[in-house]
Amino acid sequence: MKIILSILCFSYIFAQYDYILEDINPNSSTYGEIIAPSVFNNQVTLHYFGHQNWGTCTARVGQLNDLYQDLLDNEIVNVRIVAIGKGGSYENSNSNWINNTSMPILIDPVSYEVWESWGAGQRDLYFLDSEGSYVNDFNITSWNYNQIYNQ
C-alpha cells in the first residue's frame, strides 16, 4: 500500500508542475517548439505567470528577460526563465511580451489548466530545480528589480 501511495503522490507532484505549451516568441531560441519543464533537463527554471495586457506584468517580463540576458552574458546557461500568459482575449496583447524579449513566451489556453494545476496567481514566480522538482514560489508584484539587481 505504501508503494501505491508513493506512486500516486509522485504522480500528483509531477502533474502539478508540468505543462506542454508552444513557445510563441519569434525572438526565442525555442520559438515554435513545444515546451515542457522536462525540456529543460539539468537546468534550473523560473516560471513567471502574468497577464499580457497588464503594464506591471509586462514590466516584470521585461525585467526577467534582462535577468535572463545577464545570465547568458555571464555564460550561466543552466538557468532558464519562461513566461506563461493566458489565452483568449489576453492573446490580443501577446506583442507586449514578445517585443524586445528573447525568453520563451508560452500561452495557457482559455481553460487555464496550467495556471490552475500550479496554483499560480498573477505575477507569481515559480522555481524548479534541475530535476524539475518544485523549490519555491513567490509573488513579484511589489518586486523592486533595480534595488535587488544593484545589491
Which functions belong to the PLM regions below?
Residues 41-66:
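Conserved redox-active cysteine motifs that mediate thiol-disulfide chemistry
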Residues 2-15, 102:
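Sec-dependent N-terminal signal peptides
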Residues 51-56, 86-91, 109-113, 133-134, ...:
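Solvent-exposed loop/turn segments at secondary-structure junctions
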Residues 127-151:
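Thiol-/selenol-based redox modules, centered on thioredoxin-like
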Residues 59-70, 74-81, 87-96:
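Active-site-proximal cofactor/substrate-binding loop regions of enzyme domains
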Residues 95-128:
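Short, internal strand/loop/helix patches
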Residues 13-38, 59:
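N-terminal "domain-start" segment that seeds a small globular fold
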Residues 45-49, 78-85, 104-107, 124-128, ...:
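Structural recognition of the beta-strand scaffold that forms the well-ordered cores
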